[in-house]
């Protein structure tokens, strides 16, 4: 699965993208976020609060309940806030 990171997510993880293998039990965007949160302190800081993130699967905005597969490209980016 190809993961792409934008803005503060990219800064926190120190990389713009990566390709990973995920367990067969990871079937949703939310499941992927939970899996990633367990991959180390930087990942935990980014993925432990899904309310602070948005995602896209194959360049289409996705909800955390939406399905993912190992052939997908999943992008994570911070929520947009305004002032």
Predicted feature locations:
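Ubiquitin-like/PB1-type beta-grasp interaction modules and other compact soluble beta-rich domains
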Residues: 1-82
């Amino acid at each position: 699965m190809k993961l792409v990171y934008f803005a503060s997510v990219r800064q926190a993880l120190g990389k713009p993208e990566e390709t990973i293998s995920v367990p067969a039990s990871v079937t949703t965007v939310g499941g992927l976020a939970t899996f990633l949160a367990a991959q180390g302190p930087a990942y935990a800081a980014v993925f432990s609060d899904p309310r602070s993130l948005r995602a896209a699967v194959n360049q289409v905005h996705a909800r955390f309940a939406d399905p993912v597969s190992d052939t997908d490209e999943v992008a994570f980016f911070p929520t947009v806030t305004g002032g």
